[in-house]
Amino acid sequence: MKWIAPALAYLAVGLGILQFHSAWGALVGFHIVIIISLLIARPNIPLAVLLKNTKRKWIVLSILLCGSSGVALYLLWDTFGFPNDLPAQVKALGLTSSTWIPFIAYFALVNPWIEEYFWRGYLGSETKMLHVSDLVYSGFHALVMIGKVQTGSILFGLSMLVLAGWFWRQIAHENRGLLAPVLGHMMADFTILVAVYLNV
């Protein structure tokens, strides 16, 4: 079950984006699949680990480093080769003037808790080397990026996400908790989505 769960998460995102053309459907479906998988697996990881942190410096570093990702995306927007019809593509996914703000709020405030418990908690590892969970975490984002940026930008984005997964996994191990990764993930999600919102 442990490694079936990511496959089901990929399926949920793929169906939401590619079949039903719904950003909300992809995100909520992704979360439902993860939560059901965790309820079935019943990992011996207390939810309190999401609030655990032993060294404040990791929170600060995680927030600053990950928050800079959206700032960099905004400042370097033109270098990533976004198509001229990106606003239309985004609108076709159901993200309009009335739904963007709630989507950003839900994505930034809810998603990091679910993802960090799943990827760095349930599927995580204490190895300092790259782990398969880093790669699998990165990979599903390709389903969101395909058709919206050039191939080179997709590969760059996936590489950065592998590093982000590895980084969050390391600070989770150092802190014996997931609060620093959650807050960094939260800042990354928020700033990246705001950068997209401001450009479409």
Question: What kind of region is each of these model predictions?
Answer:
Residues 14-21, 75-83, 142-148:
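Juxtamembrane "helix-exit" motif on the non-cytosolic side of transmembrane helices
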Residues 3, 10, 24, 58, ...:
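A residue-identity detector for tryptophan
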Residues 46-111:
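Juxtamembrane helix-loop-helix connectors linking adjacent transmembrane helices
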Residues 1-56, 71, 190-200:
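N-terminal, membrane-interfacial amphipathic/helix-forming hydrophobic leader that caps
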Residues 22-23, 55, 96, 129, ...:
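Helix N-cap and loop-to-helix transition residues
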